[in-house]
Amino acid sequence: MKKAWLSRAQQADAGGASGSEDPPDYGDQGNVTQVGSEPISPEIGPFELSAASEDDPQSGPVEENLDAAAREEEEPHEQEHNGGDDPLDVHTRQPRFVDVNPTQAPVIQLVHAVYDSMLQSDLRPLGSLFLEQNLNIEEFIWMCMTVRHRCQAIRKKPLPIVKQRRWKLLSSCRSWRMGYRTHNLKVNSFESGGDNVHPVLVTATLGCDEGTRHATTYSAGIVQIPRISDQNQKIETAFLMARRARSLSAERYTLFFDLVSSGNTLYAIWIGLGTKNRVSFIEFVGWLCKKDHTHIREWFRQCTGRPKAAKPWLRAHPVAIPYDDPLTNEEIDLAYARGQAMNIEAPRLPDDPIIVEDDDESEEIEAESDEEEDKSGMESLKNIPQTLPYNPTVYGRPAVFDRKSDAKSTKKCRAIVTDFSVIKAIEEEHRKKKAARTEQPRATPESQAPTVVLQRPPTQQEPGPVGPLSVQARLEPWQPLPGPQVTAVLLHEESMQGVQVHGSMLDLLEKDDEVMEQRVMATLLPPVPQQPRAGRRGPCVFTGDLGIESDEPASTEPVHDQLLPAPGPDPLEIQPLTSPTTSQLSSSAPSCAQTPWPVVQPSQTPDDPTKQSRPPETAAPRQWPMPLRPIPMRPLRMQPIPFNHPVGPTPHQTPQVEITPYKPTWAQIGHIPYQPTPTGPATMLLRQWAPATMQTPPRAPTPMSPPEVPPVPRQRPRGAPTPTPPPQVPPVPRQRPRGAPTPTPPPQVLPTPMQLALRAPAGQQGPTKQILRQLLTGGVKKGRPSLKLQAALERQAAAGWQPSPGSGTSDKIVQAPIFYPPVLQPIQVMGQGGSPTAMAASAVTQAPTEYTRERRGVGPMPPTDIPPSKRAKIEAYTEPEMPHGGASHSPVVILENVGQGQQQTLECGGTAKQERDMLGLGDIAVSSPSSSETSNDE
């Protein structure tokens, strides 16, 4: 082609005519100017062709033997550039410039312009660049446009435009549709493995098609690249570092990267792993917990919503998910230490191979053989992120609660071992210990463990108040225990097959083997649900002093119900609960819901009266046929009045009382407070009286007649008091009225307090124990009488109970929460003439019952309608004429207990001081008739 252009130029210089030759037929190439008819002057340039040369018919033809490759390149563009403006019109408008539009001008014009540039010496390097063999059409056009733009920029300076950065490549031609501009942007780059930010200046050269016209040119507007925020840049950097760490890590850790990326917590991954992956997961967690992992910690927080990685194996494993072959603490510690010693870049042990993947080599290997293609396919499957079958919800902690890193303490609990040689030495030592443990034979456990009985001497207790007291008085010193305390400790529960029953039950009972009896009864009785027990003192019952024997040995069952510690300097001494014996079951057979009997415990030994000790805390015995009501948590602590108290006031025996109301069990079941004693020949249990806050049950069951079996008199030790149930004939009274030096016993037999209560006015009955309690506490309540209690007292009077002979001489104070009703002496009433006369049994007559006004004539008052408590009020009733004498006026103290639904009456003569002396209250303040406040009924 170069030779053809040179020959054409020589012909033009020679001026030879070529009219005989046919002009070249360009066919569908459009209007193409005939370039080369005249020589190109250096002043015009390669792209500035004259219009006269285009119209000259004498111009030489273009060589037809063009390069075949050039023609192949021209053919696809022929159809595109046929339409549009005629290039000749453009040349006429701009005679000194040929506009070569890439979207309209055919490519052959550019080819001619390039070859024309070869004729100029200064443009030959540009022509040689265009004639490069490796250029395609797009690159060829781009180079032409660059040369054109540069030539125009040299001739004409760019127009000044507002917000113009440096210079723009503009065109003054309206047909030019492309604009260029540069834009500078400062961005921050990150440093791998740290938080340091480096500013980088980025210069972008932008171009747009069909840009907004500015002045006489088309150009693009200013494009502002949005700058990423610091938080987003931190997050993107963290994810980039996590992906890099996953690519560099060992293959066994990539699973954990994928699971954490999908939002799973470490605990969810831990409980779902198999046995073979647990050690690797512990190493991965150890690598996550490295302190210098800034980006990895941020990646973990963004994925899971947790502030930092924790040890999931410290939490309890769920029961529903099996946990086979658990790891020991030594294995977990060693695996965690290996993870802590790993490199910060990726979780990799020193022995793990480094896999380098080359994309080009892998493509060549895939093309060589099909087998290697299958292997590469498996490798590509391994690279797919692994996820759990479910998609867990990520709950993130609000940013308000995120603490700064500088506010956290940097204390290290232990040193982190970073040397793998030390870790390997520790692993070897652990492996030797594990092998030694497996070689040792296991010790065979014994078939049955014995029951060990621990005996300890009684503890010493200094005398003094134990808890908060409501009545300030001096305490009686504690009495010593009868002997060493025996506590049964059951090491292992014996199996049911170990208990062998020899013979029948009758033979077992005839042999009187108490130990075997306890075992058999324990196997036959159903298990008892444990009832919550409060820390109150159980009732103390007398055995040694009163001559009462108990056939209940110490039970061997473990103590399940433990009492709460009472207020005091020493802890409670807990004794095991006792199971019911055969005698108790036989005695409680007629009634399936009886009041539980207290356990008998001695309170003093006559051999060593000076030994001071504290009585043990006893729990109420279990009652199998009857459900127990839970006792309130607040304990009931008091020292009751001794049974046979002397008449004179004794300051050392003033009781300490702190009464907390609670609901008794018999009030829930519906039984009267008095129950007959069991008739066993070797068992005599004291009955348990009702507390002060008894509520009348809505219905009374069928009353039971007590068995008419007189109790067997026992020989009591010397100096022990006599237990006296409510008698009918009290002993000879020893009471001294005011002003009388010597007490004068009445000649006739006086009635008992129970008979007085039976003959009292209706609605004013009640045991004297309630009167004594009201005197101690001071609060008196009002309510309806209890028909059930009246029937019980009538049965008691009909049964004819007799007290035990004799009376105690020594005084005792027993730690118990329940009062035993004392025997009240007959009260001497001052007559009208001033002489003391004994009040006979028939002196007390009926008086009208006084109810509350709003409940008068309505019926029995339910416990829920009980009005608030009232104070004691004293009223005087005129008694009618009695059989043994005239009418006498005596003040009647009406004690009304609303909480119990009873109105109790204590007829007394003389002053309140005599009453306290008679009851043994000492100096306890009781409201006198003159100072008592009369309470309103409403």
From Swiss-Prot:
Its main location: host cell. Residues 1-92, 360-389, 430-470, 528-628, 694-752, 849-870, 910-938 are annotated as: Disordered. One of its GO terms (biological process) is viral process. Keywords: Host nucleus, Host-virus interaction, Transcription, Transcription regulation. It comes from the Viruses. The keyword Transcription applies. Residues 78-92, 430-440 have a biased composition (Basic and acidic residues). Residues 360-374 have a biased composition (Acidic residues). Residues 575-594, 927-938 have a biased composition (Low complexity). Pfam families: EBV-NA3. The keyword Transcription regulation applies. Residues 601-615 have a biased composition (Polar residues). GO terms for cellular component: host cell nucleus. Signal peptide: none annotated. InterPro entries: EBNA-3/4/6. Interacts (via N-terminus) with host RBPJ. Belongs to the herpesviridae EBNA-4 family. This is Epstein-Barr nuclear antigen 4. It comes from Epstein-Barr virus (strain B95-8).
